[in-house]
């Protein structure tokens, strides 16, 4: 088993004893295209103790250390390159590679006593870093992607010092140690001091110590400024001490004034309490009486509310019924309109049906007549045709007989007969033509007659329609006139209703206007009565003075100051609080005031304070001055309104430049601001700041009412009360008239609305009739055109008639010509023939002629019947078509008529129901009107009684108010005295506190408090005289009261500055303590490490040099950090020298001794050194090599060396060589070779 391999678990080997804790070591290094290493090259495995990397110069030995630096996260410049991408291998055979990577395999082991070791299971791990062409790189731990932070954290956790890199000694670093200065010369330099502090770890205190040092300097500067401020405050305090003493004298005088005020107020308070007791009894009796009246009033109000509720209930019910009745009317009107419309529609339909029935009957009759006539003609024609042969046969027989007769008279008649036969033969065509023309004449005459009758019938229908249109137009005009009249009436009645409602609304508005006036008038009467009674019971002092004024007993009296001015209600509380002089009596001269005082004294009426105007003339110029107030707040004086301009003097004397603030915050700012002229400030809520700085107000209800919003009248006369009562009476009469006017207007518009309702129903009915007439008129107008067209023969018919007339005329002329042409010949010959045969022949001829005539008639009749049949067939066809159309129209109208009957029935039923509802509603309204009238009467009567009770109660209340006012005045006076006593006591207490606070002379204070005059009994007058005397004395004094506050402020400022100085001093001391503690901790830790390292350095140097000496020395022994550390060395058999003055080899030995001492002070599991023996001779290399060999027992050393007496001591040799510009590696275990060499021996 090899020495560097872990101990196996075989049973044949004895159990090994562990000799240490786990430590980290580098097992193997794998490089891929890194610097001079092409492809994947494995360097190692390294020995757990001492591995030497050997190889010729330029082969790539130092790249092994660069590979480790690369994995440990060092930048390219630390590996003698500019960019990371330059780490990628680049040689002739390996160009344009994408990346370079290095993997370092670590493992934790536990050293055993016999040189073997045991691997800690699961402790191995591999760190890899790969560099790319884009100068980026990536980290991996066990092939898992990682980052620089995680890598460094893991290595630090295993004991590798990556912060100071003391485990790495690169090529040339040993010599750099010898070149170090005792201390860094700049922020980026490193000297021996910084080098040692990095190892010892005291450099962590440097930044904090520097920061505390800066804080300490800042605090010292701040403290110097505060010291100057304290001295300045002390000087200002001493300057104010004299003014303070003067103010203290004034304050003692003011203390005495407060005591006398307290005594006078107490006496006035006791007198007021006695008067209050007397007034309370009188008020109690009057309130009891008023309470009884209020009980009655409450009962009456309750009853009135009930009556009002009942009245309102009935009124609402009446409105509901009226609305229902109005709705019924509207519905009934609508049904009436529908009824009229349906009646007219039904009438119109019936007329149409009747006309159609008449037409059908007439046309049916015509068809019947024509059919019968055609049948008769059809039946007659066969008979006539049958008679003709018979008559012809008879004619032949008769002609034979005639021939026989003629034969007898043949001779005579032969000539005539021959001529007649000849004539007959000539006339036979004529006869035939005559028969034809007669037939044509008969046909044309019949057709002409039929056409004429048709035109006459159509003309008659057209004339009848025109007449109906005329009648309808007349009726429409009549209805339109009636409608216009009704509309005018409706408009008139509606206007009357509107005017009545307008009168009602205007009257109600007047009533609404007058009701408050009535109430105000009643209150005014009660107020005047109360004021008159109040004046009778006015304050006896003021009353006596005003009486003297009215009687001209004393001249120059104006009255109570509060009654001589007015102010907005907003400032009532403010002026009532801030102006104590509102109860003063204003007089013109001193003599007037003395006269008043004498009057009160003689009557033993009490005391009063007077404002003498002639004493206030020095304020006149101030009245005209324009002042600029702080924050533009108003002065109370400017807000007061007066009738007499002279009264402004009095108000200015009482108020001065007192200003009004909107709230306490603003008042505080102004009162304690820089403008002393406006130090007296009152807030709207009554908080008052005096010039002395004291504040009063708050804690209870704000006092107000000492000045009105209008200037009060001097008195109330009986005449004024009578005038107010007359005014009230007029308003009451006007109200009664207006209420009567409202009632009349209501009755008037209701009557007008009822008439409008009836007229609207008639108007609707008339409008429906007009609509029906319009409909019938429109129908007739539409028919009239067709009737007119029918009455006007058609062009073809006219042409036909003309043609028929021509035919008739022509045929008549032809017949006449034919008859004329044959008649003479026939008649002459016939006469001759007849005369020739005698009478017998004549008779026979007549008979023959008659038969011939009958035959001719039959032929004519047959022709006429045929024409008649043909004409009748045409007319029957036309009439049949008209009957069919008329029948269909009649059926439609019958359906419409039936629908109208159904709708009419429904309308009638609904209208009946509405009418019944209307009747019931009207009945309910009539019944309810009586109830409403009764309820209204009861309500108004009771309201009148309640109003009278209210007026009586108001009078009583005003009396109570007057008495209460007087009582309240006494109470207010009592409270005022009480409050004043409390205020005086508070002021006294505050004054005492202020005096004690200001350290006033105790003997003077005791003498003031024990004044014999204060303790002696006296009357109120004596006390007031003392108060007045002290006030006068105080006025004569003119101390700067602000000086006390300023002195106190300066004392407080001085104390505050002292406190601030103490605070700053304490903060500085705390910072200095922290600063000193950190410096001491740094010094102690540094010296402890320094001494340890120095001793180890001495030991290491003696061991390496075999007799030399070396030590670290402080340039400044008192402060090692001020000048730094020097490295002194005494080589063997030489004197002490600074390391910088040694030879190259001596510098290397000294530096290595220091490095080894530092390693001993802070050991790490790994040490990597690059040619540390380069400058040493053979002997010293051997000494260093054996020391390293000894140190590798508990640490891993990887040393690059070219000295055989160094690398021959190594446990493993890693050979580095280069071929084809590519570095390769081979690892050799020297121990194995040694075994092989021993085996043959």
UniProtKB/Swiss-Prot annotation:
SUPFAM superfamilies assigned to the protein according to its UniProt record, in alphabetical order: P-loop containing nucleoside triphosphate hydrolases (SSF52540), Smc hinge domain (SSF75553)
Tree of life domain: Eukaryota
Domain SMC hinge positions: 555-671
Protein name, entry field: Structural maintenance of chromosomes protein 4
Residue list for modification N-acetylmethionine: 1
InterPro entries: P-loop_NTPase, RecF/RecN/SMC_N, SMC, SMC_hinge, SMC_hinge_sf
Subunit structure: Forms a heterodimer with a SMC2 subfamily member. Component of the condensin complex, which contains the SMC2 and SMC4 heterodimer, and three non SMC subunits that probably regulate the complex: CAPH, CAPD2 and CAPG.
Gene this chain is encoded by: SMC4
Cystine crosslinks: none
Domain Zinc-hook: 25-1224
Start and end residues of each stretch annotated as Disordered: 1-22
Cellular component, GO annotation: chromosome; nucleus
